Structure formats: C-alpha cells, structure tokens
C-alpha cells in the first residue's frame, strides 16, 4: 500500500490542477461532487445495489456509501462530507482511516437532508456534478453538470495517473485469478452457474462488486455478445467456453475475455489464430495511432481467418468492403477502460468535447481517439456464428461467398473473443492481463 499512497499524492495534485484550470476557464468557484443516492425498487422497500458517481470515486475509494459529497476548488484541501447516519437497521460505514484520508478535510453527515449546512453557503457560482439534478436544484445549484466542465474532465480522464495505472494493474491481477479458476472449472465439467461461483470466490468479490455482469457462456451461448444468463445444468456435450469477466480495485475496473475449446479440433485452431491476431494488433498500438485504424486492421485479419478456415471465399479486402466481416465480427475492437468499464472520453477530440464519430460502416466502435501515453484500452477481437447477422447475408449475393457447411459445423461452438487490458506507454505497450499471468 506504500507505493499506492506515494502515487496517490501526485494523483490528488493532478486532479486539483485539472479542477483549477477548468474553474478558471468557466469562472466558477468550485465543484460539488455527489456520490449518489440509493434507488428504491418499485413498490418495494429494497434498494438497488448502489454504484458511486465515477466523478466522485475518481478522487477517493469510497464506493459503497451514498449521500457523500466532495467540495473541491483546486486550491484548498478538498472537503469530504461523509455520510454516517444513526441507523440500527443497516451497517453504517466506518469513518475512513486509510492512506488517502490525510488529503481531505472530513466532515460527518448524520442526516442526508441536512447536507446544506455543510455545503458552501452560496452555491450560485458552484457547479454540481452528479445524477440527482432535483436534489441539486433544491440546494440552489444553477450550474448542474455543465457541458464545458464535463467535457474537460472526460477528455482528461483518458490519461491515467500512476495511481490509477497501479489500481488497474491490481484489478487485472485479481481478475486473472478468477479466470484461471473458471478455466479449471470448465474443464472439470462445471455448469455456467457453477463456473460463476468459482470465479467470484477466486476474486473475492460479489456479483455487485465486480465491475459488470460476467459473461459465462458455454457452447452456442458464446454467440450472444452480452450473454448474462447462467444455466444451472451442464450441456450434454461440452464444446466451448467464453468468459468475459473483470474485477474491481478501489473503483477501477479490469475487463478480460478468454475462449476455450474442450477438445483439440478446428475450433481450437481458430482460437489460436485469433490469439495470434490479437497480439499482432496490440503490437500496433503506439502514441499517434488512430484507434479506428486498429479496428479496420482487425477486420482485415478477420477476413483472412474467414478464408483460411473455409468460412468464406473471395479476397480479404472484398470481404471487408462488402460488410461480410461485420457479420462475423459485429462489435468494436475495444474501448477506454478506467473508473467505468466503457470509460468516458473515447470519442472526444479535445477538451471542449468535440465528438469524433465512429466510421459509418462500424457504428459500434466505442473509441475513435488518437492513442497517447497513459491511456488504457481493451483489445478484444472476435469471431462469432450469429444467425441473425448471417441470415442478412443470405438475402443477397453475399451469401454465395459463405461456406454454409463450415458455418453449420462451427455454430454449436458459438464464437470467440479474446480481450486484454493494455496501457499505452511512450515507448512500449504494457499488456497488464498477460504480464500478470493470463498467457492464453
């Protein structure tokens, strides 16, 4: 923790610098950042799992306590208003006592509706950052999530501090242990539900603590891109396993995917080809490279795989130009990663929030930025047998280029995705996922 504490001091200094700069530009006195409030289920007395405002947890790892507030102006010591009610029904969060607390002036709040007593007296020139605009209005904030402030912060969130990079390494290290446990469970005959339990146990996090709903897909379920159901029964014949699962550390996410074949066969060879292609794409990452160019390079590699594995005929560029590769690889190559799994800033050209749209032919690409040092991105090429997309090819002449017999043979395996989390450095790439123990 000493290393993290050392990096944290510089992290807070950088956040204060960013705040001071945008406040000066926008002639604001400061920012009031709300952690959030509980959300009650409809017609019930149970709350949905609480998720803290990412702008709040960028400053400190208070992740599970609603009704907290940060008051920052880039000059003075940030003020943390920490919610600690008198409550005999629920566990009350302990007063923080960690390496980061020395950087905050901490005040305790016992009643959520009394927060105005601890906030700046005149909020007219302060900006509220958070979800609950009705609360902000009652408290007198006329500036609520102002575009100029949000665009500036989102643009700079893509450049990670050393503290953030270390948190993300630890999130990867934790997730790798879960992936290894899940892989072992798959080869030992576990069901999707059982594999999920092995994963969560290995990472030591609950379903509400991991950064997103795990994808644990056996056989043809791997063709469903965001498959989050969990079958309790093992399939009669075990063919393949796709796992897309991450872990959290101090609010930062990892997002890792692997695909396995149960036996050595043609599908296993296709996984090996995808693994090779993914590593080649990662080698292409460097400052100054346009992320959409990496996405287009992925389609070229997918096209070659379609030809090599007798899934399609023709020439590779023609398969891309006709949209045939998009039927087999319909999603983007990856996205920014950080406080959120699909982190903000992926389309921002500048601090003003100028939007760089995804290419028209690739609308699901989540990042159009030019790569720069200390950015963290996922790299997740895939190839799937998705009938709804392939049926579109059958409706025109493109269907004549598809070897439907090979498609039928691979359909029971679902699909392949391989995903690593990569830091772009000035002179190298740091593949956190592989370097921390998940070689394949």
Curated annotation (Swiss-Prot):
Cofactors that this protein relies on: Mn(2+)
Top-level EC class: hydrolase
Domain of life of the organism encoding this protein: Bacteria
Keyword Transferase: no
Disulphide bridges, residue numbers: none
Family statement: Belongs to the peptidase M24B family. Bacterial-type prolidase subfamily.
Name used for this protein in its record: Xaa-Pro dipeptidase
Organism annotation: Shewanella sp. (strain W3-18-1)
Gene of this entry: pepQ
